[in-house]
Regions:
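Boundary detector for helix-to-coil junctions that initiate low-complexity/charged tails
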Residues: 1-50
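Glycan-processing catalytic domains of CAZymes
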Residues: 37-433
Length: 433
């Protein structure tokens, strides 16, 4: 474990209030990225002619490169119901008034995706979409095809990020279209992203664009914002309870009282209770004692501390690279995704097909190198067996990060290099004996 990660781990365990921790972190981040603001745009090539020639060949071959595991679309019969796969769904793929104001007219996540460059030979960037192309989620047919593909390959639920800030929503147009059009027949749920909206979209953390108001009144009001959607016949339930996930549970003030209020109002309006998931994102892990029904792991954050870091063993082309590189293959083959403290507790596991946010953060990104569909399949098969044997879980649920987080290199959707291979691996993991 390197010193930076060790200090981060210690910081989040210090017994200070979440608000104070966030404030201290914000000050640190602002100073850190003020000093590094120019680093992201600096390209200082290594002095190795042979390596630069190999890099040039790698870049030129990327236009037509297809991996040996590449798969074309394949129709399947109904998938086995041996596990429920819930995939996170990002709606930042259509113009939005806020993004127009902050980044320029027409800016979407595709702007980040298309400008990514490999940081070393063998670094799989840019990740470019396959069949679905650089889609616009305002167009119904695009979402219809996403649903068709997801259901064909065994993805059971879309977990839409819900961005709500004291009455103001962002990235809402695609989700509104889905909610209003019942012909889009896909089970869904919400993950409330209850944190500040910052400049991370462009690869920096400093600068809050929309702040999260962490008042009791704001958190009480939130449940009234989403209750109207709970009666949708497509909304996902766990044991007859309405599923709702909270990304930053530690930011909820007087959490027991707020949760009790949410439950009361939901029962009055819908005739049934909530099933609340608390994400293990940045906080301590005892949320069932605070009123949540369960916790869930969060990839890639949940496994960073036990992963093998290989940053120093990779010859980066840009000497200014200031990110981190982890070994996905080592993590899967040695089952480092098993988080022992979560076993025996009501904590649902998570998985990521891959992870690489250099599209957003350039040479300060985090890369999980050596990710492949066959390794993802091995990991998923193991999780499916696990959730079906764990008596403490109410359902065999696995959270997948993600369906379409292209800017973070975490997606199941078809791309140019692998085609439908990750989706085929998903189907095989669920259906093979």
């Amino acid at each position: 474990m390197n010193t930076k990660r060790m200090l981060k781990n210690i910081f989040w365990k210090i017994p200070l209030s979440p608000a104070l921790k966030d404030g201290l972190r914000a000050k640190y981040v602002q100073k850190k990225f003020e000093s590094e603001s120019k680093v992201q745009d600096v390209i200082e090539c290594i002095d190795d002619d042979e390596e630069l020639r190999e890099y040039s060949k790698y870049i030129l071959s990327s236009v037509t490169r297809k991996d040996k595991q590449h798969q074309n679309y394949e129709m399947h019969d109904d998938s086995k119901g041996n596990a429920t796969l819930i995939a996170y769904f990002l709606t930042q793929y259509s113009p939005d008034n806020h993004n127009d104001e902050w980044w320029g007219r027409g800016t979407t996540e595709w702007n980040n995706v298309s400008k990514a460059v490999p940081q070393f030979v063998g670094h799989r960037q840019p990740n470019l979409p396959g069949e679905l192309g650089f889609y616009d989620l305002r167009i119904k047919e695009n979402m219809m095809r996403q649903i068709e593909i997801a259901q064909n390959y065994g993805v059971d639920v879309f977990n839409f990020y819900y961005y709500w800030f004291a009455g103001e929503r962002i990235l809402e147009k695609p989700l509104n279209m889905f909610l209003e059009d019942k012909s889009l027949k896909m089970p869904f749920m919400f993950c409330w992203a209850n944190e500040n909206w910052t400049k991370r979209f462009s690869g920096t953390d400093e600068g809050i664009l929309i702040g999260m108001e962490n008042s009791e009144e704001n958190y009480r009001q939130f449940i009234h914002e989403v209750i109207p959607y709970f009666s949708d016949e497509r909304y996902f339930n766990v044991q007859g309870k309405i599923a709702l996930q909270i990304y930053r549970p530690e930011l909820i003030p007087n959490v027991e009282e707020i949760i009790a209020y949410w439950r009361k109002e939901t029962i009055v309006a819908c005739g049934k209770d909530l099933y609340l998931f608390a994400c293990q994102s940045k906080s301590g892990f005892a949320w069932c004692a605070k009123g949540f029904d369960a916790e869930n792991e969060w990839m890639q954050g949940s496994i960073r501390m036990q992963a093998k870091e290989i940053t120093g063993h990779i010859k980066k082309i840009n000497k200014s690279f200031a990110g981190e590189i982890f070994d996905y293959e080592d993590m899967v083959l040695n089952k480092k995704y098993v988080i022992k403290r979560n076993l025996g507790r009501k904590v649902y596991p998570a998985i990521m097909p891959s992870w690489d946010n250099t599209a957003r953060r350039n040479n300060r990104g985090t890369i999980w190198h050596n990710s492949r569909p066959d390794l993802y399949k091995q990991w998923l098969k193991d999780l499916i067996q696990s959730v079906n044997s764990r008596k403490e879980l109410d359902m065999p649920i696995i959270f997948v990060n993600a369906w379409n987080e292209w800017g973070e290199g975490a997606y199941l959707e078809p791309d140019r290099e692998y085609g439908f291979a990750y989706l085929q691996a998903t189907w095989e993991a669920k259906n093979e004996e």
